[in-house]
Amino acid sequence: MSSSEVASHYNKVLQVGIEGRKESRIFFMRNMNNWVKSQLINDAKQRVNDNGVNNPRVLDLACGKGGDLKKWDIAGAKDVVMADVADVSIQQAEERYKQMFGYKKNNIFTVQFIVADCTKENLEDRIENKDPFDLVSCQFALHYSFVDEASARIFLKNAVGMLKPGGVFIGTLPDADRIVWSMRNGENGQFANEVCKITYENVEELAEGKVPLFGAKFHFSLDEQVNCPEFLAYFPLVKHLLEELDMELLFVHNFAEAINKWLEPGRRLLESMTGLETYPNEKLSGKSDDEYLEAKAKLDAFPEDERIKTMGTLSKSEWEAICMYLVFGFRKKKSEAEKTEEEPATTKPVAESESEQKEVTESEEKEDQEDCEHQEAQTN
């Protein structure tokens, strides 16, 4: 699948109103995905602060419709470059920024919007300000470049080529190992539940264990959204290619691990973003009681005198779909001379205030849900 076909797919995705999104079968899953992304950006923000930078220069690669613009504002960004292959998505991102600018006047970061195929073009040639980036983010999009080795290498070079030593590269992408395991254990090379269906194009290739490192095409349909072919990106391979570009791994977690890691510090924001469904209630999103067996068991396990009436949860199908993704963080290596010259940095507290939480929550409701990147368009 060519980059022009990917662009055409995302350009055709229709925007859905807030009320319409609330009726979606994956409403809570989308909110949870956005919460995970918020926590990931918050983690990166702290690491950048620890590197002595309080107002980072940011590259938002495969930015889609600009769903993270408010997040960059809250992160204190001074300058952001937003690049995407889909021209309609970039137009919508520009409109979002104009709305933010009108509200905040001059108290906002500057932005350059670029329509570019980052699997073929040298993005640096298109960027006006040649200063290096402190932070690069690529959400639910990196794996599209793994159509072939050349495309993947160019995309990753664009991602980290202008990243300063000590700078951070974060992202989310489908967990190739988990997806392959799920398809192999399904019927006819596919996995399906109430909210998603994943199929591998070459069933014989899958059955024989001959899935290639590049060009391994699969289809991920989510909540009856338009299906755009994608490519598996094995994380050990992603890590290897980035290490060739002087990057070092900071962390990698599947979404289940990430949620457990960030749950306590981010609980209030998760509640504000409606990332969990209240169980039991009269209008559960799942179609059967089987979707909530674990939640029911946990409630029933409480002693009679301590029993609570409700709890927050996700349906079984939403949880299975969420577990198909992972988050990662890399850092650009510093030279020995740079390490020697370093002095302790004065860091800025990273915890979000209540007002910041309210702002990002309102942003997620009004805008980011249109932009859960791969999840949203099929989620930015």
Swiss-Prot record:
MRNA binds at residues 33-34. Pfam families: mRNA_G-N7_MeTrfase. Keywords: Methyltransferase, mRNA capping, mRNA processing, Nucleus, RNA-binding, S-adenosyl-L-methionine, Transferase. Residues 336-380 are annotated as: Disordered. InterPro entries: mRNA_G-N7_MeTrfase_dom, mRNA_G-N7_MeTrfase_euk, RG7MT1, SAM-dependent_MTases_sf. GO terms for cellular component: nucleus. It catalyses: a 5'-end (5'-triphosphoguanosine)-ribonucleoside in mRNA + S-adenosyl-L-methionine = a 5'-end (N(7)-methyl 5'-triphosphoguanosine)-ribonucleoside in mRNA + S-adenosyl-L-homocysteine. The record marks 65, 71, 96, 143, 230, 325 as: mRNA cap binding. S-adenosyl-L-methionine binds at residues 37, 62, 84, 117, 139, 144. Residues 24-333 form the mRNA cap 0 methyltransferase domain. Its EC number is 2.1.1.56. GO terms for molecular function: mRNA 5'-cap (guanine-N7-)-methyltransferase activity; RNA binding. mRNA-capping methyltransferase that methylates the N7 position of the added guanosine to the 5'-cap structure of mRNAs. Binds RNA containing 5'-terminal GpppC. Belongs to the class I-like SAM-binding methyltransferase superfamily. mRNA cap 0 methyltransferase family. This is mRNA cap guanine-N(7) methyltransferase.
